[in-house]
């Protein structure tokens, strides 16, 4: 068992209140910026996904909130 190593997962990054970062252009760099600023390897705009059009991050650290089932409370 390794200590001091954080695990990561691929997921929708969440704003406060369980809302996704909305996006509208699959080729924009917006989501990659949001994801990498939060420690992910990369990110992109997932169109028509489970929670609509939202930023999907690759290898997002476990300490960063992700979109979970339930309502987005704006």
From Swiss-Prot:
GO terms for molecular function: sodium channel inhibitor activity; toxin activity. Residues 9-73 form the LCN-type CS-alpha/beta domain. Its main location: secreted. Disulfide bonds join 19-72, 23-45, 31-55, 35-57. Residues 74 form a propeptide. Has the structural arrangement of an alpha-helix connected to antiparallel beta-sheets by disulfide bonds (CS-alpha/beta). It comes from Mesobuthus eupeus. Residues 1-7 form the signal peptide. It is found in: Secreted. This is Sodium channel neurotoxin MeuNaTxalpha-11. Belongs to the long (4 C-C) scorpion toxin superfamily. Sodium channel inhibitor family. Alpha subfamily. Expressed by the venom gland. InterPro entries: LCN-type_CS_alpha_beta_dom, Scorpion_toxin-like, Scorpion_toxin-like_sf, Scorpion_toxinL, Scorpion_toxinL/defensin. One of its GO terms (biological process) is defense response. One of its GO terms (cellular component) is extracellular region. Keywords: Disulfide bond, Ion channel impairing toxin, Neurotoxin, Secreted, Signal, Toxin, Voltage-gated sodium channel impairing toxin. It holds the Pfam family Toxin_3. Alpha toxins bind voltage-independently at site-3 of sodium channels (Nav) and inhibit the inactivation of the activated channels, thereby blocking neuronal transmission.
């Amino acid at each position: 068992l390794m200590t001091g190593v954080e695990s990561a997962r691929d997921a929708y990054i969440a704003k406060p209140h369980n809302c996704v970062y909305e996006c509208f252009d699959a080729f924009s760099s917006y989501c990659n910026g949001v994801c990498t600023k939060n420690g992910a390897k990369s990110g992109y705009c997932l169109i028509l996904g489970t929670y609509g059009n939202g930023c999907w991050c690759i290898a997002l650290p476990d300490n960063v909130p992700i979109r979970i089932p339930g309502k987005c409370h704006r």
